Amino acid sequence: MKLCVALDMASKEANLALAHELSGLDVWLKVGLRAYLRDGAKFIEELKGVTDFRVFLDLKLYDIPNTMADAAEVIAKVGVDMINLHASSGTHAMRTVMSRLNALPSRPLVLAVSALTSFDESEFSAVYNENLAAAVRKFSVMSYEAGLDGMVCSVFESRLIKDTTSTDFLTLTPGVRPFGESADDQKRVADLSAAKEQGSDFIVVGRPIYESNEPREICERILGKI
């Protein structure tokens, strides 16, 4: 299991300072929509310049197939190591993206978002008119058959996805509160032991690290447990 640290702070300077503080640790860095819109591809270059960090660019692509493929190709050429898109964009869109990326000399890992961890069962049903677990199964099969590398899901769906597809199909799980911290705006959260039990390949941790006075120490504690 790998730790992915969310760089969700309010300024590029704060995010870069955290990256420098974590230099040398075996962690991934997650760059979200706000940071990328504000700081652009140059920010990715700066992160890569700190040390040999691998970067997950969390933009959750969702559009018509060719537009998604165009965007994915541009993102891949920025040099990130993982990207994501919405499974609900459909099988054709996901296959179009993978066909485009597989034609490149190298490509990032591509994960599909099943259901945002800010959704609970009732909110998900109101949007998709479907049971959460059933939808996750459907989305995981669609993504697996489209040739993606894995899924973004809650800890509680990780084992379900692997049982439905393959143990090699990656799961990245946001909403992890390693030591029982507040859930904030997440609904389906879990701790480290649950993430390990459910077979998560990547865990995303943000606030418990960057809101700490000792973020490197928190990362080291997490790494020691995974």
Swiss-Prot record:
GO terms for cellular component: cytosol. It is an enzyme of class 4 (lyase). Its EC number is 4.1.1.23. Substrate binds at residues 8, 30, 58-67, 117, 177, 186, 206-207. Signal peptide: none annotated. GO terms for biological process: 'de novo' pyrimidine nucleobase biosynthetic process; 'de novo' UMP biosynthetic process. The active site is at K60. SMART domains: OMPdecase. Homodimer. Belongs to the OMP decarboxylase family. Type 1 subfamily. HAMAP family: OMPdecase_type1_B (MF_01200_B). This is Orotidine 5'-phosphate decarboxylase. It comes from Campylobacter curvus (strain 525.92). The gene is pyrF.
